[in-house]
Structures are given as C-alpha cells and as structure tokens.
Design a protein with these regions (language model features):
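Membrane helical hairpin/interfacial module
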Residues: 47-98
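Signature of multi-pass transmembrane helix bundles
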Residues: 1-54, 99, 103, 107-289, ...
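C-terminal TM-helix exit segments that contain a strictly Trp-centered aromatic cap at the helix terminus
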Residues: 55-64, 381-393
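Membrane-interface interhelical connector segments
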Residues: 63-81, 289-310
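Mid-membrane cores of alpha-helical transmembrane segments in multi-pass membrane proteins
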Residues: 73-79, 97-105, 125-132, 153-157, ...
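C-terminal halves and exits of single transmembrane alpha-helices
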Residues: 79-99, 298-322, 393-401
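Hydrophobic alpha-helical bundle architecture
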Residues: 113-117, 306-386, 390
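Membrane-helix interface and helix-disruption motif detector
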Residues: 88-95, 119-121, 141-149, 219, ...
Length: 448
C-alpha cells in the first residue's frame, strides 16, 4: 500500500508529469490523432523540464550569493526555504502529507467540477509542500488520525481553488485573456501587489515601456540587463565579503571579477531558459486543456507555476527581484537591531515571489506599482515568518522555515484557529474559506 501511495505521490508532485497527464487526457477527449496526442504530451513534458532546468540554473547561481552575503555582513539567522523545511518534515509527516495531497487534489477537482471556481491547481510540488505544511500544523495542534487527513484535504482543496480565483482579475490584465490562472502559494503577495499597484493606476507607465538612451539601447533586451545587474550585485557583494574569502571558499581560486561576471550571466541564462519553457508550455497546454474544460470539468482553467507570467513583463521580473531583496536586507537589519530571531533574505524566494509580485503590481500601476508591489512582498516574507515560527513545533528550531506568503498567512490564521479552538477552529476556518469562495464567485467573469 505504501509503495502504491509513494508511486502516486511521485507522479502528482512532478509538475511535468502531472501537466502532461492533463494534456494527454485533454487531447484524447478531443479525439485528436495519435500523432498529435503524442506530440502534445511530450512537448508539455519538455516545456516543464525546460522551465525546471532554468529554475535550477537560477537557484544554483543564487546559492553562492547567499553565502557571500551572510559572510559579508556577519549575520546568522533563519533562512526561509520551502525545500529545506519540507525535507525535514517528511521524516515524521511523510505518509500523512502524501494522503493529504492526494485527497486534496480530488477535493480541488470536485470544486472545479461542481462550483464556479473552475481552477485546477497543477503546480504539483507546491501542492505537496502545502500538504506537508498542513500535516505539521494539525499534528502540532494535537489533531491526529483520520481527522488530520480529512481536514487537511479540505483546507488544501479549498485554497487551491480560492487563491487562483483571487488573482484571476489581475491575471486577465497580465495575459490579455482568460485561458490560464496562477497556481503558486505566493498568492497573498501577488494579490497585495496588485492592490497597492492599483493606487498608481494611470500615474506610471509600464515597466516594458522604459526608454533607454540611444547608447544604452542594448539594455532593452532583458537578458543583457539582467546579466549586467546581477554581475554588479555579485561584484559588490564580493567586495564586502573580501577577495580572499571569495577565492578560498566560493570561487575555487577564480578571480572574483570573472566569477561575478559568470554568475551574473548564468543567472540571466536561467531566466532565459525559464521563459523558453513557459512559451512552450503555453503553446501546448492551452489547446490541450480545451478537452478538459469542454467535456470533463466544464470551463475549467489550469493554474500554473509563477514563471508563467514572466514573459509578459520581463523588465518587471528584474525590478521585482532587486526591490524585494533590498527590502528584505533592510528588514533583516531592523530585526537585528531589535534583537530576537533574524530572518535572512532567502534569495530564491525574493526572486520568484518578488518578480511575480512586480508583474502583478505593474499590471495595475506600471513602474511605481511594480516597485511598491515588490517592496511589499519583501516586507511580508521578512516579517511574517516571525509570527509563524511557533506553529512549527520542534521544527521551529531548525534555522529554516517556509518562505512563501500563503504558507505563512495560512499558517498564522489556521494555526491560531486550531491552537486555541481545536477541531472547532479547523471547521470554522474551512467555513470562512468556503464563504470567501462564494464571495469570489462574481469576480470570475471576465470584465467587458
């Protein structure tokens, strides 16, 4: 039984396989020729593997930056990282998390089939992280046994339907259509970025309309501007950390200037690969998903990972990362001055959430909206972990925590509910999220 469960989880937690399976079913339902089904399925897998490869390149290029930064400023503290905290949690909560994930995805599909929230959440690894997260919260709050699975699955299925719905009005502005949704557990940041961006509506041009002097026109190409910006960030960080430290501990004796340049261009290459993968996914999943939306789950939409929005505002991606990270650094020093736990800037989280928040802010309020939205994200992912740490139980001392805002906000609200009210608090939370779903019903119709 455990082997079967592990096999199912392995499939569902791999976005490439999960989305390819959806594309495969969609093409079969449309009665496409075998050649089209094979091509569409393989291209969907290929698109996600390309996206994942790009994300890995970005993450690997950022890892040395985090080490350099910590050494440069001599700060020790908690580094938010989803993968790290989940890997620790699986030792004690693995089976429970797997069952919550499988049952939660079923709940999500049932909600999409029988309600007006037509979003099928396809970011498999994030679904698994949230399942592990819920297993921790419920167990620490002494809700155990089958109740953990039932409550966890209901909460997971509901938020996988509600959060994409919350973002869809701005997603329509970003993409110019209503064919795809965003399925990523940084939704609170993105919604907040869109809301703060709305304050600058009509007051600022889009990030994609930035005009460069003729001599700097090459910076209009995002890959080049990202390369230069990241190389400069690395160069400055290396100077603060000390050349000897870079040579001995980071660059394997490579000159720190050359090292900075290579890391900056590597980061840009990762972003370029991500964008290539996104374009391939969109070209395949949207037509294939028509079979699902027309026959099996009428009018449903795929909710996909956050890089899906990067091609629509590539300048905002760079602005968002930079602003969110700088905000996180400022927040770190504020926490350091006040004593207590210090949240170090998680570079990966600041990139993916900050970039996406800036895209949402830009859609509503142009450049000012992008900057404000990314800064707000930086504040949220720096200070919210402090409120969330008590709900991790014994894992709270692991020097890491969840990094994305939905984990943190759901953890704080849901964690307090079950901590002080037990099972009743969990049920009350489910009712409130369900009521939110009803209120969101009117937001799902495209504006004329």
């Amino acid at each position: 039984m455990q082997a079967i469960l592990n096999f199912i989880v392995d499939i569902l937690s791999q976005p490439a396989i999960l989305v390819a399976l959806i594309a495969f079913i969609g093409l079969i339902v449309q009665k496409k020729p075998a050649a089209t089904i094979t091509s569409g399925t393989i291209k969907t897998i290929l698109g996600f593997l390309i996206l994942s490869a790009g994300a890995d390149v970005v993450v690997r290029s950022l890892e040395p930056f985090g080490k350099i930064f910590q050494h440069a400023f001599g700060v020790q503290g908690i580094v938010p990282n989803n993968e790290a905290i989940v890997s620790l949690a699986l030792k004690d909560f693995g089976t429970t998390a797997a069952l919550i994930m499988v049952c939660g995805m079923i709940v999500n599909i049932l909600i999409a089939r029988f309600t007006n929230l037509k979003y099928i959440f396809l970011t498999g690894h994030h679904t698994f992280y949230m399942a592990a997260f819920l297993a921790i919260i419920l167990t620490v709050s002494h809700i155990k046994g089958w109740l953990t699975i039932v409550i966890g699955a209901l909460v997971l299925g509901l938020i996988m339907a509600v959060l994409p719905a919350l973002l869809q009005p701005t997603m329509r502005k970003i993409t110019g259509n209503d064919q795809v949704a965003l399925g990523h557990f940084g939704s609170i940041s993105y919604f907040a970025a869109g809301a703060v961006g709305q304050l600058f509506k009509g007051k600022s041009k889009s990030t994609e309309e930035i005009k460069f002097p003729k001599g700097l026109s090459f910076l209009r190409e995002s890959t080049i501007s990202i390369s230069i910006t990241m190389a400069l960030l690395y160069f400055i960080a290396c100077l603060f950390a000390g050349v000897s430290y870079i040579h001995e501990s980071i660059s394997d004796s490579q000159n720190f200037i050359v090292f900075s340049l290579i890391q900056g261009v590597t980061f840009a290459a990762g972003v370029f690969i991500i964008l290539t993968g996104v374009r391939l996914i969109l070209a395949e999943i949207v037509p294939a998903f028509k079979g699902i939306s027309e026959k099996l789950v009428p009018n449903s939409k795929p909710a996909l990972d956050c890089p899906i929005v990067f091609p629509y505002a590539q300048n905002a991606v760079l602005i968002g990362f930079f602003v969110s990270f700088i905000t996180g650094v400022i927040g770190m020093f504020i926490l350091f001055l006040f004593g207590g736990a210090v949240i170090l800037p998680g570079v990966v989280a600041h990139f993916f959430l900050g970039a996406t928040a800036a895209v949402f802010g830009n859609a509503r309020g142009g450049i000012k909206g992008a900057v404000a939205g990314a800064a707000l994200n930086g504040v949220l992912i720096t200070f919210l972990p402090l409120l969330f740490l008590p709900f991790l139980g014994e894992l709270g001392g692991a020097a890491t925590t969840f990094s994305d805002t939905d984990f943190l906000t759901v953890g704080i609200v849901f964690g307090n509910a079950v901590k002080y009210m037990g099972l009743f608090g969990a049920i009350l939370f489910i009712i409130i999220v369900g009521a939110t779903a009803i209120l969101l019903k009117g937001r799902q119709k495209p504006q004329q």
